[in-house]
Amino acid sequence: MKKIKLLFFASFLSLLSFSASAVDITIARFFGDCEDAGSDTTVTSGEACIIQSIINAFNEQNPDINVTTEVLDWGQTYNILQTRYADNSAPDIHIMHRHRIPQFSSIGAIADLSGELEKYGMDSGDIVPMMMDALTYDGGM
């Protein structure tokens, strides 16, 4: 399941590379810190370091986009996110457990990305069915 999540994460970052101008993006996560991950995803281990190495590689390949990572306190992650959505200071992207999607969807924090795949020439049929199930909520992706 971790490989599926990481594959989706890498695919999502690739969508960002189609941006036309310089962009700063913040990704928040709740599972550890990893500053020295490098950018070689083939030699990195541990979920936090693998994701950080994907971000580092993405940043190297896309100089007009700067993705930074914010590590949230594990025990307070969802409280922090709710507060930050309420005061318009939420991160651009954040990682969450699937069972939290309804909670955050109800406050308008979940974007439907269904049309984004086709927009960038990607086919949802290329996504592993189990991953597609995990990414689908209330008819959207």
Per-segment meaning from a language model:
Residues 20-109, 118-125, 139:
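Conserved N-terminal structural module of periplasmic/extracytoplasmic solute-binding proteins
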Residues 127-132:
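FAD-site-proximal beta/loop scaffold in flavoenzymes
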Residues 8-16:
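Bacterial N-terminal signal peptides
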Residues 1-8:
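Bacterial N-terminal signal peptides that target proteins for export
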